């Protein structure tokens, strides 16, 4: 059970919500603020004075006054008309994060929503009744309206859900959770819809995957150093301390740790080779830069996870209603775009190491890592697959945040595209997973070919894991299943665990 303290969520909590079957409860310390916000909205609605989002229309229709007897209909219509998402359902892990983030934002007491509505969301979450939310349809301002409308529609008994993974109607979902459809009161529909929770959830969910891939890439890169008979001298701490970047210093330390005591490395220490290619030698510089970007993105996303991104905002202590733009997800878009750059570079560097390993003139290994080359093609086309994926990632890494299209009759004339920025991270991560799987296979093959010498004590278990699932490549065979099984292990963090390094979300 995780206790949500609004405004004080942590990265480890968010990773657990996404990855583990934890349940949620709301910190009772938040109840007074929630109730005060709801009372403030009720008082404003009772007075009848115009207040945006409470008794007016929305967007370009904000100047239209809504009579008191139509306020509930206004909120219902808002939810139903905004539930216009398209595409595949959002991943279960992202929906869980989205719901938790929405609860945290509402729980800070500046949205004017009743606890009854929040309790219904928690009940659905804990019953494993998750809204079916189409993943496409948000421009990241005014908030993630369409995705959050699909979440909110379920509370009204409209739309679809997944009940313990099985697709069903919203009414069936409410029934399983022991709930009845809600009638939303003044401002409640808007409070549910306005916010950056979809883009932030997608960015966090994919960031956790990219963190796992980063650790895997450290391991794969170290194994490739041994496979290519590369030097460990470029990882000397003194080199990296002179430059001073934290990520670079820590990445170099990880490579030193992983390669310490390698018999392969000791066997060629006195060779006449002066320098390795950049894909081996400059790993700390590249991976360190990726690490620094990822950490910055994590800092930004954690702030956003704890933010109130509603509009308008209720200040119960003064009774004021202030309209602003906290729903604009530009910080999330920038963070997601930075993550895309890092994830694409992780894959790009791994692809270059694969290319090095299969090139006999660079690696000193048999061409394409197979004996009897010619009749056997070995890793030739596996590298082509890695190249195709790395190239695709370069296109996907183009920043979404540089684009904007005006919406709502030019009332919302600049938008963030944060949801797309966050969503495409999943494709980049998936591509990078397969690139790393191919590298792990190629590096393991190269290490085998260095016999009688072996890799380091830290990397020996990695070799054992690979070889327990995929045999040494002797002759050409149907290769795709080999890549698939190692990619599955990459996704399960089987290799990430070997990295002497962890992110804040894992602590």
Curated annotation (Swiss-Prot):
Top-level class of the enzyme under EC nomenclature: lyase
Gene Ontology process terms (BP): L-histidine catabolic process to glutamate and formamide; L-histidine catabolic process to glutamate and formate
Pathway involvement of the protein, from the record: Amino-acid degradation; L-histidine degradation into L-glutamate; N-formimidoyl-L-glutamate from L-histidine: step 1/3
Stored InterPro entries: Aromatic_Lyase, Fumarase/histidase_N, HutH, L-Aspartase-like, Phe/His_NH3-lyase_AS
Catalysed conversion reaction: L-histidine = trans-urocanate + NH4(+)
Post-translational modification, as annotated: Contains an active site 4-methylidene-imidazol-5-one (MIO), which is formed autocatalytically by cyclization and dehydration of residues Ala-Ser-Gly.
Domain of life: Bacteria
Major subcellular location class: cytoplasm
Modified residues (2,3-didehydroalanine (Ser)): 142
Keyword vocabulary terms for this entry: Cytoplasm, Histidine metabolism, Lyase
Localization of this protein: Cytoplasm
EC number per UniProt: 4.3.1.3
One annotated Gene Ontology cellular component of this protein: cytoplasm
Keyword Lyase: yes
Position of the 5-imidazolinone (Ala-Gly) cross-link: 141-143
Family according to the record: Belongs to the PAL/histidase family.
Protein name: Histidine ammonia-lyase
Gene name of this polypeptide: hutH
């Amino acid at each position: 059970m995780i206790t949500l303290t609004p405004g004080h969520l942590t990265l480890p909590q968010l990773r657990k919500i996404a990855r583990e079957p934890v349940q949620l409860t709301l910190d009772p310390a938040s109840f007074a603020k929630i109730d005060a916000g709801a009372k403030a909205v009720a008082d404003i609605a009772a007075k009848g004075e115009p207040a945006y989002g409470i008794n007016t229309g929305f967007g370009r229709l904000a100047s239209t006054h809504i009579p008191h007897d139509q306020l509930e209909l206004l909120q219902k219509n808002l939810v139903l008309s905004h539930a216009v998402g398209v595409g595949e359902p959002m991943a279960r892990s992202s929906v869980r994060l989205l719901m938790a983030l929405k609860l945290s934002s509402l729980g800070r007491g500046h949205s004017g929503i009743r606890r009854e509505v929040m309790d219904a969301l928690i009940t659905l979450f804990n019953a494993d009744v998750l809204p079916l939310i189409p993943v496409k349809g948000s421009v990241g301002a005014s908030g993630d309206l369409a995705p959050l409308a699909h979440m909110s529609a379920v509370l009204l008994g409209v739309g679809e859900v997944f009940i313990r993974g099985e697709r069903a109607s919203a009414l069936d979902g409410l029934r399983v959770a022991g709930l009845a459809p809600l009638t939303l009161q003044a401002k409640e529909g808007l409070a549910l819809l306005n916010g950056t929770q979809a883009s932030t959830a997608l960015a966090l969910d994919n960031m956790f995957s990219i963190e796992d891939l980063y650790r895997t890439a450290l391991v794969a890169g170290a194994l490739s150093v041994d496979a290519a008979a590369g030097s460990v001298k470029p990882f000397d701490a003194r080199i990296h301390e002179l430059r001073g970047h934290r990520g670079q210093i820590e990445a170099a330390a990880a490579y030193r740790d992983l390669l310490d005591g390698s018999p392969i490395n000791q066997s060629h220490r006195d060779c006449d080779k002066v320098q390795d290619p950049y894909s081996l030698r400059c790993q700390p510089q590249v991976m360190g830069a990726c690490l620094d970007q990822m950490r910055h993105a994590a800092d930004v996303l954690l702030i956003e996870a704890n933010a109130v991104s509603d509009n308008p905002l209720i200040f119960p202590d003064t009774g004021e209603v202030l309209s602003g733009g906290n729903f604009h997800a530009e910080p999330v878009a920038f963070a997601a775009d930075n993550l895309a750059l890092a994830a694409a570079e992780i894959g790009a560097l791994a692809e270059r190491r694969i290319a090095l390993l299969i090139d006999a003139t660079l690696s000193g290994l048999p061409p394409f890592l197979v004996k009897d080359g010619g009749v056997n093609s070995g890793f030739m086309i596996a590298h082509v697959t890695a190249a195709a994926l790395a190239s695709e990632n370069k296109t996907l890494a183009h920043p979404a945040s540089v684009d904007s299209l005006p919406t709502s009759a030019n009332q919302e004339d600049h938008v963030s595209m944060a949801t797309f920025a966050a969503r495409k991270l999943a494709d980049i991560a998936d591509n990078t997973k397969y690139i790393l799987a191919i590298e792990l296979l190629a590096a393991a093959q190269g290490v085998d070919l260095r016999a009688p010498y072996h890799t380091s004590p830290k990397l020996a278990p990695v070799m054992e894991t690979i070889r327990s699932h995929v045999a040494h490549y002797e002759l050409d065979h149907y290769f795709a299943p080999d890549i698939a099984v190692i990619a599955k292990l990459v996704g399960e963090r089987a290799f990430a665990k070997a990295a002497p390094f962890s992110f804040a979300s894992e602590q």
